[in-house]
Curated annotation (Swiss-Prot):
Keyword Signal (UniProt): yes
Domain notes: The cysteine framework is XXIII (C-C-C-CC-C).
Molecular-function GO terms, alphabetical: toxin activity
Official protein name in the record: Conotoxin im23b
A single Gene Ontology CC term: extracellular region
Propeptide segments, given as residue ranges: 23-28
Domain of life: Eukaryota
Organism, scientific name: Conus imperialis
Signal peptide start and end residues: 1-22
Keyword Signal found: yes
């Protein structure tokens, strides 16, 4: 029973995280300054309290070049 509840909780957390990242991607495409340069988009992403690694991947996902001095490390 405890294992079943743990699995259910894990699934809910994963679904919520996936939904949040999808929402951020949708929102970024709507924001004009996020579409201009990778650096501007990265800056917007960081202001959303997302991690550095996530933002670097996010900028690459929307076909922009992330800031090399931050994302190459």
């Amino acid at each position: 029973m405890i294992m079943r509840m743990t699995l259910t909780l894990f699934v809910l957390v994963v679904m919520t995280a996936a939904s949040a990242s999808g929402d951020a991607l949708t929102e970024a495409k709507r924001i004009p300054y996020c579409g201009q340069t990778g650096a501007e988009c990265y800056s917007w992403c960081i202001k959303q309290d997302l991690s550095k690694d996530w933002c670097c991947d996010f900028v690459k996902t929307i076909a922009r070049l992330p800031p090399a001095h931050i994302c190459s490390q």
